[in-house]
Amino acid sequence: MYRTGIMTPCRTRHRLVGDFKPEEIVPHEHAYIVEWICTVSELDGNGFGVDIDLLTAKLDKVMQGIDGVLLNDLPFFRDRQSSIENTALFIAESLFHELASEGYPMSNMREWEVRVWESDTAWASFVKTEFH
């Protein structure tokens, strides 16, 4: 297996719903680092697993859609907590739709992981293993 990954910064806002500290239930901002790691079973004819430029363009597009946005206002989070776990899921599914809408061949893709880093030492991720 081969893994290729990229990282980008992102600032989003959210508020937690439920029994949390007062500062967590009011809208507040996080400076996240989002990491996208793609795993493929074999390299293409050029010796690459995935095109880093394509990954960067797609991740940048998805990040532009949430940069500075209050996540709770997005339809995806209407019935979900705006946790970093669900933020990773949202980003992973958004990336899948971006690539699928272009007809990107997913037959070689085995998994991808989206990690959302909240600090230098804390992150949550979603691992996608189905690409249809």
Sequence positions of predicted segments:
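Charge-rich, low-complexity N-terminal segments
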Residues: 1-132
